[in-house]
Amino acid sequence: MSLLKTSERGFSRELPDVQSTLPDVRINLTRVGVKNVKKLVEVTRPGKRPVIFISNFDIFVDLPGSLKGANLSRNFEVIDEVLQSAIEGEVKEIEQLCSRVARRLLDKHEYADRTEVQMRSEFMVAGETPVTGTLCQEVVKVFASAIAQRTFKDPIVRKSIGAEVTGMTACPCAQNIMQERAREVMENLDIAKDKIESFFKEVPMATHNQRGRGFLSIETDDESHVKLEKIIMILKQSMSTPIFELLKRGDEGHVVLSAHKNPRFVEDCVREMARRVHAEFGDLPGDSVVTIAQDNEESIHQHDAFAERQATIAELADEINGENLDVS
């Protein structure tokens, strides 16, 4: 058993290092660590004011069966050290911060072969309404993580960055039902078919709506970079319409009209995200992993609708380019 020196009331004594003793059951543990560590994160940006995140961290290491416990205090030492380097401008992105922490954990926990860092926070996005240009803000949930694996050479690190955005969708199925009903009524009123079609182009029919939550994360190697702002933009553009905290009457009419001119199923949202990811991030390494999900809160049903896709950048490219399209 190793001993630790401590100072108490002016004298030194040696205490046993209980964590380094043998456990009663000698099996390896996949993850040992701390969860919900709240920290203020300041990330510098060239030519702009820093971005401030109030974040929750989960920090883990694996533990061999020969040790009773992990030295959890080292996790706090590492994260404070890396957060200070972020304030000093050495860290530019939150996923880079997670990567730094994961690497340093391997240095601090010499017995660990794998470390993992997860970060959850909120990001304020400034914008303006579509008609009146009223300035507004939106809170977006953001996520970052990193996993470091010890090797005989340098550690292998995989990092990810993602966001969750709320928007609005309009149901295409119910809209089609309402349109056929309106067409029947107008035909019975002897309105010409060309005028009916012209009307539908300008005034889309009513349908039920959903408040949708889109999620997108991209996992890459440690050398690649994914801009958080682009992820947020993809999410906003993949639903029927973005939503806003404050809407004047002209803005409100524009948002409702835009949504009903762009009806989308939950499946459509996920596929549109995938298309935009391919267009925006197609130059990332082919083994980069994309996770896309859409969760819609139904207005006329008691359930929610959900769709998801996980694929590599290479797999998305093959499907979007038609190379692996299943037409059976």
Swiss-Prot record:
Q: What UniProt keywords apply to this chain's record, in alphabetical order?
A: Hydrolase, Iron, Metal-binding
Q: Where are the transmembrane segments?
A: none
Q: Which cofactor does it need?
A: Fe(2+)
Protein's pathway: Cofactor biosynthesis; 5,6,7,8-tetrahydromethanopterin biosynthesis
Biological process according to GO:
tetrahydromethanopterin biosynthetic process
In the record, the note on similarity to other proteins reads: Belongs to the GTP cyclohydrolase IV family.
Q: Does the keyword Iron apply?
A: yes
Write out the catalysed reaction: GTP + H2O = 7,8-dihydroneopterin 2',3'-cyclic phosphate + formate + diphosphate + H(+)
Known function: Converts GTP to 7,8-dihydro-D-neopterin 2',3'-cyclic phosphate, the first intermediate in the biosynthesis of coenzyme methanopterin.
- Protein name listed in UniProt: GTP cyclohydrolase MptA
Cofactor remark: Binds 1 Fe(2+) ion per subunit.
Q: Describe its assembly.
A: Homodimer.
- GO MF, any single term: GTP cyclohydrolase IV activity
Any one Pfam family here would be GCHY-1
Q: What is the lineage of its organism?
A: Archaea, Methanobacteriati, Methanobacteriota, Stenosarchaea group, Methanomicrobia
Naturally occurring in which organism (per UniProt): Methanospirillum hungatei JF-1 (strain ATCC 27890 / DSM 864 / NBRC 100397 / JF-1)
Concerning PANTHER family, the annotation shows: GTP CYCLOHYDROLASE MPTA
Q: Which InterPro entries match?
A: GTP_cyclohydrolase_FolE2/MptA, GTP_cyclohydrolase_MptA
User: Is Hydrolase among the key words of this record?
Assistant: yes
NCBIfam families named among the record's database cross-references? GTP cyclohydrolase MptA (TIGR00294)
